[in-house]
């Protein structure tokens, strides 16, 4: 994990997206997640199911799930180009019965420059509207120091 100086933080902006992490049913016996816990996202280039896979890990570096497929291509590009994304567990695990298995509700936090995040916000907003995913998006704002 990269340590960021206050000066770097002052030039960074953030965007929050409330969605979920999928696949917890495959990992919950080995990885525990608590409400309020900060989770970390990283690229998973060797994933045999998707070349855009983004894995979500807890503070113990244990896998707790993956970014949903409908977000993985966007998040993969973001991580490749900008590099910082984390998630906070905001509720108890659930299964909506749509074949996604156990999911964890999370608030994804994307950090980068304002221009890139505003473009990303627009892209996410359009995708959310077109497909009725019901994601909750914040506006792009300066990082809280």
Model regions and ranges:
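Conserved active-site motif detector
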Residues: 1-145
């Amino acid at each position: 994990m990269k340590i960021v100086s206050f000066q770097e933080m002052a030039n960074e902006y953030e965007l929050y997206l409330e969605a979920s992490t999928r696949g917890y049913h495959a990992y919950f016996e080995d990885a525990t997640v608590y409400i309020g816990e900060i989770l970390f996202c990283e690229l998973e280039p060797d994933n045999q199911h998707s070349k855009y896979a983004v894995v979500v890990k807890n503070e113990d570096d244990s896998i707790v799930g993956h970014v949903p497929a409908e977000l993985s291509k966007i998040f993969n590009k973001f991580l490749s180009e900008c590099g910082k994304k984390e998630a906070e567990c905001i509720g108890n695990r659930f299964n909506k019965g749509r074949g996604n298995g156990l999911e964890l509700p999370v608030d994804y936090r994307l950090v980068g420059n304002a221009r890139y995040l505003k473009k990303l916000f627009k892209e996410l907003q359009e995708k959310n509207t077109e497909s009725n995913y019901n994601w909750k998006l914040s506006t792009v704002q300066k990082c809280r120091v």
